């Protein structure tokens, strides 16, 4: 009511009275505006950051069935280790369908069942992940360049506080890749950079760049049907979560930063 009275007296008075009222009310509102601005700035700057460094490993096996020239299905099993290769991280079972829309454009749909290890004394958490991959490529000589867009949704089966994290986490991943085919060897070294951004993080945090991944690797054709892939990846991962006080207001933002060095090996077979 006080603000409404100030507004009415300020803009519905006339002449000199209006000027005096405007000056007086401005002096009253300035301290309030300054206090609100200071509080908002302090809230935005209240962020506590922790850092983690880890060496990790991934081992996988992929079985692909060609369905004609343009269609294929793949079953992939992957084991992930963390804490300097000393502890199980996750187990992925992924089923995918790929379709070559054009020689330069490929679309694929994926479902992954993820068994996530939550530490000693706790059961594995099962997660369901669905995503699409849309890949455009350009070839020139022995070089191949590609851009991949990947919208992804991960459903958590364990309880998730919606004020801290989304029960179904949506992200969008962008990957730019360069690959070179070494003539007469079956060897294809590659490098890529991938960015992951959140799409539905809690309002208290806001959407942000969640992960930056860079990778160097090589694919080697053992036979016409089998292949081996070896890679090194560096992940810089960010995880922002609100921490609440006793009054259920955001006390600060906990920001975990992880630097992960990953060695991976995959065997693939096509039939």
Where are the regions that the model predicts?
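Membrane-embedded beta-strands of outer-membrane beta-barrel proteins
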Residues: 61, 95, 132-134, 174-176, ...
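Repeated loop/turn-to-beta-strand initiation elements of outer-membrane beta-barrel proteins
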Residues: 69-75, 104-109, 141-145, 184-188, ...
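Solvent-exposed loop/turn segments connecting transmembrane beta-strands
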Residues: 48-57, 81-90, 120-122, 201-208, ...
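Outer-membrane beta-barrel "beta-signal"
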Residues: 131-137, 257-271
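Transmembrane beta-strand segments that form the barrel wall of outer-membrane beta-barrel proteins
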Residues: 45-49, 71-85, 106-119, 149-155, ...
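Outer-membrane beta-barrel transmembrane domain signature
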Residues: 150-249, 270-271
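Hydrophobic/aromatic-rich structural module bridging two neighboring secondary-structure elements via a short loop
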Residues: 87-140
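Bacterial N-terminal signal peptides
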Residues: 28-39
